[in-house]
């Protein structure tokens, strides 16, 4: 049996040899908002013509576990295309309705201008989840466009014990994107394809829901490629996340994930 190499995610001085544990911020109920302080707001003079894209992520633990926006930013730097400047408003278990009611996301949108605002909630494979996703996509979209941005939808995935829900999740996010003429970022579809093609590439973390480093790498490939419109075939398997942070995916796994990500639209 061939021994498998493990992905390594280093966030600052914290080494995670594998995915976030079940005691992550999501399970502890700790809200996360990356680059969402005054210094970030004061640094919003980036010029799109100078090769910058400003992206706001609104979501929950599917976004903040492994810090997806940070990985997307790292990919933009490694790729040599427009540099992404990302902010994140994300709280455990939040739907778009929760974000709308709390108000932080709406205020962050108003702090624009943005190029893209990426919306995400849970898999939304049920009728109720789909209704919430579509309804609040309709509510957020005018605010997003007023801020000079295009709405985008980060399609996520169901729990590992609910793989039958992939189709419902994909349909929900496609409908939301279609209704507001937004961009679809089909990470969930890429996950489904990857699991079918090579289930030995572990996308799920130990809780069977949140992503491993490989899962976050795949999701980030889809998000970065979808927003930048640049090819991702040569994206490095090792990324510098700034400071001491880094993400390292085994070369063989990274090759599989790049090919899968390039095949979804």
Where do the model's predicted regions map?
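Positively charged n-region of N-terminal signal peptides that target proteins for export
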Residues: 1-4
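Alpha-helical cap/lid subdomain in secreted, periplasmic
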Residues: 106-217, 221-226, 230-236
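Bacterial N-terminal signal peptides
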Residues: 6-17
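Conserved catalytic region of serine esterases and O-acyltransferases that act on ester linkages
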Residues: 210, 221-265
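N-terminal basic, low-structured, amphipathic or hydrophobic segments
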Residues: 30-31
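Conserved SGNH/GDSL esterase-like catalytic core that processes O-acyl groups on lipids
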Residues: 53-56, 62-135, 145
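Boundary at the C-terminal end of the N-terminal hydrophobic targeting segment
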Residues: 17, 22-27
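A cross-taxon signal for low-complexity, glycine/charged-rich
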Residues: 23, 35, 41-45
């Amino acid at each position: 049996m061939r021994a498998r190499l493990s992905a390594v995610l280093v966030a600052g001085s914290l080494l995670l040899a594998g995915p976030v544990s079940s005691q992550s911020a999501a399970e502890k109920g700790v809200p996360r908002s990356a680059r969402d302080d005054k210094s970030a707001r004061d640094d919003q003079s980036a010029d799109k013509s100078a090769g910058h894209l400003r992206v706001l992520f609104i979501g929950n633990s599917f976004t903040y576990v492994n810090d997806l926006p940070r990985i997307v930013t790292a990919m933009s730097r490694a790729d040599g295309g427009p540099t992404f400047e990302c902010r994140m408003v994300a709280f455990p278990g939040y739907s778009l309705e929760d974000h709308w009611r709390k108000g932080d996301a709406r205020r962050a949108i108003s702090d624009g201008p943005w190029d893209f605002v990426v919306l995400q909630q849970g898999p939304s494979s049920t009728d109720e989840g789909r209704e919430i996703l579509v309804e609040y996509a309709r509510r957020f979209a005018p605010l997003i466009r007023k801020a000079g941005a295009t709405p985008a939808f980060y399609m996520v995935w169901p729990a590992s014990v609910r793989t039958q829900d992939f189709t419902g999740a994909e349909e929900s996010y496609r409908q939301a994107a279609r209704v507001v003429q937004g961009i679809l970022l089909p990470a969930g579809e890429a996950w489904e394809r990857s699991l079918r093609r090579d289930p030995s590439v572990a996308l799920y973390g130990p809780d069977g829901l949140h992503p491993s480093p490989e899962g976050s790498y795949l999701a980030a490939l889809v998000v970065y490629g979808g927003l930048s419109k640049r090819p991702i075939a040569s994206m490095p398997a090792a990324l510098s996340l700034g400071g001491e942070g880094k993400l390292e995916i085994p070369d063989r796994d990274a090759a599989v994930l790049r090919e899968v990500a390039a095949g979804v639209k």
